[in-house]
Amino acid sequence: MTPEHLPTEQYEAQLAEKVVRLQTMMAPFAAPVPEVFRSPVSHYRMRAEFRLWHDGDDLYHIIFDQQTRSRIRVDSFPAASALINQLMTAMLEGVRNNPVLRQKLFQIDYLTTLSNQAVVSVLYHKKLDDAWREQAEALRDALRAQGLNVHLIGRATKTKIELDQDYIDERLPVGGREMIYRQVENSFTQPNAAMNIQMLEWALDVTKGATGDLLELYCGNGNFSLALARNFDRVLATEIAKPSVAAAQYNIAANHIDNVQIIRMAAEEFTQAMNGVRQFNRLQGIDLHSYQCETIFVDPPRSGLDSETEKMVQAYPRILYISCNPETLCRNLETLSQTHNVTRLALFDQFPYTHHMECGVLLTRK
């Protein structure tokens, strides 16, 4: 695979290899046959980051080869959304012959939605002044005149200039309802929107008929907790990043959801609070013990669950675990399988044509 060519004819074979690999990894835990969710074969990535290479009068996007670190020119990127591909061309056309916008420009980040909105961040090794803002506003207006619904952000050391806003609103059909998700520049969002819809609908399916409340750790912008709120009496969710918490609060209001409470704290801190080890001012007014959480949802970083959180989640009858790293999932399952059985398993092909796998498991207490 190269950045400008996807081996789409090999899609089914690469997916079959992942299925076999996941089944092998999960065999020690008596997991069921995985439910397999396919990605679109192209234009599936909703965000992308590129370095910029200045070559005389020419200017182009590059990425670095992960093995050799050699640079690879990228004029089109079929893994990314059609909107990103349009913007890649339009941005370079607008910047290439503009000294104010081009000088010291070293990176462009693109974030797009299925609702056809975009935030483009341009990163510089220089101070951004009024002249830059004037030229950037002219570029933004020119892009919009081409029918591109785009917001521009300038970044430099200790500087962030939003010409309008630093977010876009995604709209996803999930289980027969349209969900609105505010996505903030430079914050985590699911990269493959089509796969995200399938992940949300799978999570809805496996929690159908659930009783009691839901606890979610690492909730981000509320991606899962808001979609799952319809299946539970109440949802209590934690997240550490301020922009993500603010986006989650917006999303609660935008979706007219009244049974979700977001707490800004790390999973490790929440574990301490639940165990009575520490008290937190952020929890004033929230009676943790009034929640009857019979299901816990975790979507941890690649490092998986730490040992204390492992112990904490074992206290819940049902554990729903979304993993972007099956190796750390299996490490966690060595502990979790002592008290719980794996009753559902899913493979989500979030990153086609790569080694990476995303998977989901539902564990129920023995």
Swiss-Prot record:
It is an enzyme of class 2 (transferase). The keyword tRNA processing applies. GO terms for cellular component: cytosol. The keyword RNA-binding does not apply. InterPro entries: MeTrfase_TrmA_AS, MeTrfase_TrmA_CS, SAM-dependent_MTases_sf, TrmA_MeTrfase, U5_MeTrfase_fam. The active site is at C324, E358. Pfam families: tRNA_U5-meth_tr (PF05958). GO terms for biological process: tRNA methylation. Keywords: Methyltransferase, S-adenosyl-L-methionine, Transferase, tRNA processing. It comes from the Bacteria. S-adenosyl-L-methionine binds at Q190, Y218, N223, E239, D299. It catalyses: uridine(54) in tRNA + S-adenosyl-L-methionine = 5-methyluridine(54) in tRNA + S-adenosyl-L-homocysteine + H(+); uridine(341) in tmRNA + S-adenosyl-L-methionine = 5-methyluridine(341) in tmRNA + S-adenosyl-L-homocysteine + H(+). Its EC number is 2.1.1.-, 2.1.1.35. GO terms for molecular function: rRNA binding; tRNA (uracil(54)-C5)-methyltransferase activity, S-adenosyl methionine-dependent; tRNA binding. Belongs to the class I-like SAM-binding methyltransferase superfamily. RNA M5U methyltransferase family. TrmA subfamily. Dual-specificity methyltransferase that catalyzes the formation of 5-methyluridine at position 54 (m5U54) in all tRNAs, and that of position 341 (m5U341) in tmRNA (transfer-mRNA). This is tRNA/tmRNA (uracil-C(5))-methyltransferase. It comes from Klebsiella pneumoniae subsp. pneumoniae (strain ATCC 700721 / MGH 78578).
